[in-house]
Amino acid sequence: MACEPQVDPGATGPLPPSSPGWSALPGGSPPGWGQELHNGQVLTVLRIDNTCAPISFDLGAAEEQLQTWGIQVPADQYRSLAESALLEPQVRRYIIYNSRPMRLAFAVVFYVVVWANIYSTSQMFALGNHWAGMLLVTLAAVSLTLTLVLVFERHQKKANTNTDLRLAAANGALLRHRVLLGVTDTVEGCQSVIQLWFVYFDLENCVQFLSDHVQEMKTSQESLLRSRLSQLCVVMETGVSPATAEGPENLEDAPLLPGNSCPNERPLMQTELHQLVPEAEPEEMARQLLAVFGGYYIRLLVTSQLPQAMGTRHTNSPRIPCPCQLIEAYILGTGCCPFLAR
């Protein structure tokens, strides 16, 4: 059976299961005369079955949907960037294994294993009342399992280098169109579903604020800025051409084909530390910060996991922070907790 990508037109389609905070986002039907878009407004959602192979996003349908909002974004500008970021086999497997049902299943297995180990260990000691001992074992297993679940939930609130940050190139191409991409996943029946969100955001004010903030940090907090930027890096594998052996001095005497060719030999790979936000002019660094963490912001926005703010700069909701507030407080701030989930 063929797998067809689905398009959710934002406010007019059914509520995606992974967006409990949809009501907190500006919504509405496709715009009429005089209707304006607001920062944080969901434009459309592409949904595809992650259990099918091969798959691809129906970006043509998304392009048509964006045109109904008056946004002209040719899909060719970001098609390869989005699909190469999210649809590689290893990324799709990661999304499945990192889904909420898989985490729940792991927690159940963890509880059973911990309970059995604690119970078997307790049999070596005399605990008096058998039922009291069983209760203590159960409470200990439940406590450890709840701790594991809390660790999982805290991990989900960090920027995910395997999903969120892979959209940096696509978001960099879409910044000038006032659109940001974000990715979430859900499970429908036995199917893993990837959801690609298109959200409207005019980031010029955020760019200006972050430019000024980066310039100020370069002047008065340069060591802190360098420390925070040094954490914004990922490890990448790149292919390396094997060094050719030294041949005869006269190139005319060299054989046309190498003598010790091994067609089944695996290519050489090397790991490189790639800086996500390299040192540059403040405005360029501000745009790069927004591109890198735009996918992270959108995921937190559509799943209602953004930290509550007492005021906002560039969104209509007084309790929803804008991207520059999130980056200022949690990426460039003085907090000691790591913000990348690797």
Swiss-Prot record:
GO terms for cellular component: plasma membrane. It is a multi-pass membrane protein. Residues 1-30 are annotated as: Disordered. Its main location: membrane. Pfam families: DUF4481 (PF14800). It is found in: Cell membrane. It comes from the Eukaryota. The keyword Transmembrane helix applies. InterPro entries: DUF4481. The keyword Zinc does not apply. Keywords: Cell membrane, Membrane, Transmembrane, Transmembrane helix. The chain crosses the membrane at residues 105-125, 132-152. Interacts with ITGAM; this interaction inhibits ITGAM degradation via the endosome-lysosome pathway. Interacts with ITGB4; this interaction prevents ITGB4 degradation. Stabilizes cell surface expression of ITGAM and participates in the adhesion and migration of phagocytes during bacterial clearance. PANTHER family: TRANSMEMBRANE PROTEIN 268, TRANSMEMBRANE PROTEIN C9ORF91. This is Transmembrane protein 268. It comes from Homo sapiens (Human). The lineage of its organism: Eukaryota, Metazoa, Chordata, Craniata, Vertebrata. The gene is TMEM268.
